[in-house]
C-alpha cells in the first residue's frame, strides 16, 4: 500500500481559454480511476494499528473513556442520593436515565478539552513530520485542488480560488498543482456566469492548462457524487487531491506542507486541517468566529490527541490520497426511502470510515495554520444548514453497523448522531425536573407555600441537587474557561484578540448571547430530529455567504410561533406559581426574545461596531494573512462589477 499512481503527462499544450463558446478545451485529458461502490454488509479492517499512530494511543483512549465513566458514576451516585429518599417514582427514573446520558456526553467533551488544553499549552501534538516553522519542502508529485460549487455567486467563488492560486504560485511550486472548479449548478443563468468568470480568471492569471472547469449535467449524489465523478474521470493523473469548499481559502505554504506530508507518509490516506472561521461581519458571525478561534483549538487538539490515526474528515480543507479514496470510498446508496435511504448526505464521515477500513491512516493537524472558511451570517442560516446536517448524521444509523469499521470510526458516527438527540433530551430533562416537584413534594397546599422547584431541589438530600447543578454548569463551561486561560498564556494571541480584558468581555457576551439563543436552537434541533424521524427530507439549497439581510416578516414567520409559545408557557407557569416562572425564566426568556435577538445579531453594523470596540476580535483581523487580504480585494472588486446572477 504505497499510494503510487501512474502519472499521465501534464497538459501543457492546451490553447488559451478566452471564451467557452469558442469550443476551446476546459478540461485536461482524462485519466480514469476505478471507484467501486463499497459494501456495508461485507468487509474487514485491513490494518489494526497504523505506523503513524502516536505512542500510547491506547492509554489516551483509556483516559477519555475511563475519565468519562468515572465522572459520570460519581455524578450518578450524587443524583441517587437526591432521588432515592422517599422512594423512586417513574418520573425520577426518567430523570436519572436522561441525566446519565447527558452528563456522560458533557463529561466526555470535558475530558477531551482538558487533553486539548494541555496539548495547546505544551505546544505539542505535531505529527507526520509537518513542521510549519521549517523551510518549505520541495514537492515531487502532482496535486489537484478541487472546488465544488452549487448555485454559488461565481465572482465571489473564483475570487477565493484566484487568491489560492496566486498564493501557491508564490511558493515557487505551482507546476505541481492543477485547479478544478467542479460545478453542480442547476440554475442556467448561474451556469453561464460561471463559464464567463472562469474564462476571465484564466485570462487574468495565465491559468490556461492549469485551471479547469467542469459542469455536470446530472448532479446525482450531490457533493460526494461531484467529487467521485472527478476521481473516475481524472483521478489517475494526481496522487493527491485537496478538497475545498465554496468559501475555503488556504495559503500556498499550508498546501505545500500538506502535500509534503502525504509524500513523506505513504500509508496516510487523509490529512484534515482545522479551518479558522474568518470574514464575519454580522454580530452572529463574529461571535461564532471568535468562539471558534478561542475555544476551537482546545476542542480540536483534544480530539486529535485521542483520535490518533483514526481521525475524521470534515468534507473540505483536507488533502486525500486519490488512489486510496478511489479504492475504498465509493459510497453505496442506502436502502429505503428518504430521509434515511438514498444517497449518503453526510458523506465525509462515511468516506473516512471506509478508507480507514481499507487500511489507510487518517490524521488531523490542528496546529497547521493557513486554512480558512466562513461561517453562516445569521442564526437562521446556521439552523438551515444544521437541519441538513441533522438528516445526514441521523442517516449514519444505517452505516454505523457496517462490517469491518474501526471502533473509533463507529464512535465518530455515534457522536454525530448523539449531537442531535441531546437537544430533545435536554428539553425533556428540564420538563421532568419541573414535573417531579409539581407532582409531589414541591406543593404544600396545607401550609399555603407557593410551588418552588428551587426550594424542593435545594431541600433534597442536604442540597446535593444544587451541587449537581453547579458541577454540570462547570463541566459545560470548562472549554470556554480553558480556552481563555490558553489565550492568556499566549501573548501574541492574547494581543490579537483585543487583550485580556476585551477577550474576557467577548467571552462573557458570547456566553450570554449563546444562552439566549440556546432555547431556540434546542427547539429547532428537536423539531429537526422529529421531522427526520417522520420522513421529511431537508432538500439541498445554496448557502448564504454574506450578511443575512433578514426582513421582519421573515423573522416573524420563522420565530413568531416560538415567541408566542414562550409567552404562553411563561404565563401558565406564573399562574401556577411565580417561583415556577422564575425557575423556567432562562428558557422562557430565550423563546420570547428570539425575534429581536436574531434580528440584532444578524446586523452587520452591530458586528462592525463591536469590532471597532475591540470585542470579538481575532488574529486574522489584526494581522490578516496575505491570502485573505487578496481574496477580500478580489471580492470587493467583483462586487463593483455588474451582477451576473
From Swiss-Prot:
Q: Which GO terms describe its cellular component?
A: plasma membrane
The record's Gene Ontology biological-process terms are: glucan biosynthetic process
Q: What is its EC number?
A: 2.4.1.-
InterPro entries per the UniProt record, alphabetical: Glucans_biosynth_gluTrFase_H, Glyco_trans_2-like, Glycosyltr_2/OpgH_subfam, Nucleotide-diphossugar_trans
Recorded metabolic or biological pathway in which this protein acts: Glycan metabolism; osmoregulated periplasmic glucan (OPG) biosynthesis
Q: Which UniProt keywords apply?
A: Cell inner membrane, Cell membrane, Glycosyltransferase, Membrane, Transferase, Transmembrane, Transmembrane helix
Q: What is its main location?
A: membrane
Q: What enzyme category does the UniProt record give? A: transferase
Enumerate the transmembrane spans: 62-84, 99-121, 417-439, 466-488, 501-523, 554-576, 581-603
How does the UniProt record describe the way this protein sits in the membrane? Multi-pass membrane protein
In alphabetical order, the GO MF annotations are: hexosyltransferase activity
Q: Where in the cell is it found?
A: Cell inner membrane
Q: Where is this region: Disordered?
A: 1-28
Classification via PANTHER family: CELLULOSE SYNTHASE CATALYTIC SUBUNIT A [UDP-FORMING], GLUCANS BIOSYNTHESIS GLUCOSYLTRANSFERASE H
What this chain does, per the entry, is described as: Involved in the biosynthesis of osmoregulated periplasmic glucans (OPGs).
Assigned protein family: Belongs to the glycosyltransferase 2 family. OpgH subfamily.
* Identification of the protein by name: Glucans biosynthesis glucosyltransferase H
Amino acid at each position: 500500500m504505497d499510494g503510487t499512481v501512474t502519472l499521465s503527462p501534464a497538459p501543457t499544450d492546451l490553447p488559451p481559454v478566452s471564451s467557452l463558446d469558442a469550443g476551446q478545451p476546459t478540461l485536461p485529458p482524462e485519466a480514469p480511476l476505478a471507484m467501486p461502490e463499497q459494501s456495508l454488509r461485507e468487509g474487514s479492517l485491513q490494518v489494526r494499528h497504523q505506523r503513524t499512530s502516536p505512542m500510547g494511543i491506547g492509554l489516551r483512549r483509556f483516559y477519555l473513556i475511563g475519565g468519562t465513566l468515572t465522572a459520570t458514576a460519581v455524578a450518578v451516585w450524587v443524583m441517587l442520593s437526591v432521588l432515592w429518599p422517599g422512594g423512586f417514582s417513574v418520573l425520577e427514573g426518567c430523570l436519572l436515565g436522561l441525566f446519565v446520558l447527558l452528563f456522560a456526553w458533557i463529561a466526555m467533551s470535558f475530558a477531551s478539552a482538558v487533553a486539548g488544553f494541555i496539548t495547546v499549552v505544551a505546544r505539542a501534538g505535531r505529527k507526520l513530520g509537518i513542521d510549519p516553522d521549517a523551510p518549505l519542502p520541495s514537492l515531487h508529485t502532482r496535486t489537484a485542488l478541487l472546488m465544488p460549487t452549487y448555485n454559488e455567486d461565481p465572482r465571489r467563488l473564483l475570487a477565493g480560488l484566484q487568491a489560492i492560486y496566486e498564493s501557491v504560485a508564490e511558493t515557487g511550486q505551482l507546476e505541481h498543482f492543477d485547479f478544478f472548479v467542479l460545478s453542480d449548478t442547476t440554475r442556467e443563468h448561474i451556469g453561464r456566469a460561471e463559464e464567463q468568470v472562469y474564462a476571465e480568471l484564466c485570462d487574468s492569471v495565465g491559468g490556461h492548462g492549469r485551471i479547469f472547469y467542469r459542469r455536470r449535467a446530472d448532479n446525482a449524489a450531490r457533493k460526494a457524487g461531484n467529487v467521485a465523478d472527478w476521481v473516475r474521470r481524472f483521478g489517475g493523473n494526481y496522487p493527491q487531491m485537496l478538497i475545498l469548499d465554496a468559501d475555503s481559502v488556504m495559503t500556498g505554504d499550508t498546501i505545500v506542507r500538506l502535500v509534503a506530508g502525504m509524500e513523506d507518509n505513504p500509508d496516510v490516506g487523509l490529512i484534515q486541517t482545522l479551518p479558522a472561521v474568518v470574514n464575519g461581519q454580522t454580530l452572529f458571525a463574529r461571535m461564532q468566529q471568535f468562539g471558534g478561534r478561542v475555544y476551537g483549538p482546545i476542542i480540536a487538539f483534544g480530539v486529535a490527541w485521542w483520535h490518533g490515526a483514526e481521525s475524521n474528515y470534515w468534507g473540505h480543507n483536507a488533502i486525500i490520497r486519490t488512489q486510496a479514496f478511489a479504492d475504498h470510498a465509493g459510497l453505496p446508496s442506502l436502502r429505503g426511502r428518504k430521509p434515511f435511504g438514498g444517497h449518503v448526505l453526510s458523506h465525509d464521515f462515511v468516506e473516512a470510515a471506509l478508507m480507514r477500513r481499507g487500511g489507510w491512516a487518517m490524521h488531523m493537524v490542528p496546529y497547521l495554520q493557513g486554512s480558512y472558511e466562513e461561517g453562516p451570517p445569521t442564526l437562521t442560516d446556521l439552523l438551515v444548514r444544521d437541519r441538513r446536517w441533522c438528516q445526514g448524521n441521523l442517516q449514519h444509523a444505517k452505516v454505523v453497523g457496517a462490517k469491518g469499521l474501526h471502533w473509533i470510526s463507529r464512535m465518530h458516527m455515534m457522536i454525530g448522531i448523539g449531537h442531535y438527540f441531546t437537544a430533545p433530551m435536554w428539553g425533556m430533562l428540564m420538563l421532568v425536573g419541573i414535573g417531579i416537584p409539581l407532582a409531589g413534594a414541591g406543593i404544600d397546599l396545607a401550609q399555603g407555600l407557593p410551588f418552588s422547584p428551587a426550594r424542593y431541589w435545594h431541600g433534597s438530600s442536604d442540597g446535593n441537587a444544587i451541587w449537581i447543578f453547579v458541577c454540570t454548569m462547570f463541566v459545560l463551561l470548562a472549554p470556554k474557561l480553558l480556552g481563555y486561560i490558553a489565550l492568556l498564556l499566549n501573548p501574541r494571541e492574547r494581543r490579537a484578540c483585543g487583550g485580556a480584558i476585551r477577550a474576557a468581555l467577548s467571552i462573557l457576551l458570547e456566553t450570554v448571547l449563546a444562552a439566549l439563543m440556546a432555547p431556540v436552537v434546542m427547539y429547532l434541533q428537536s423539531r429537526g430530529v422529529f421531522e427526520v424521524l417522520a420522513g421529511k427530507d431537508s432538500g439541498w439549497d445554496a448557502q448564504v455567504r454574506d450578511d443575512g439581510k433578514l426582513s421582519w416578516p421573515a423573522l416573524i414567520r420563522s420565530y413568531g410561533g416560538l415567541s408566542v409559545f414562550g409567552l404562553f408557557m411563561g404565563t401558565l407557569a406564573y399562574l401556577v406559581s411565580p417561583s415556577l416562572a422564575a425557575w423556567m425564566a432562562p428558557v422562557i426568556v430565550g423563546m420570547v426574545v428570539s425575534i429581536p435577538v436574531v434580528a440584532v445579531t444578524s446586523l452587520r453594523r452591530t458586528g462592525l461596531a463591536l469590532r471597532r470596540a475591540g470585542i470579538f476580535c481575532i488574529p486574522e483581523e489584526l494581522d490578516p494573512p496575505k491570502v485573505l487580504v487578496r481574496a477580500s480585494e478580489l471580492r470587493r472588486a467583483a462586487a463593483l462589477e455588474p451582477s451576473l446572477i
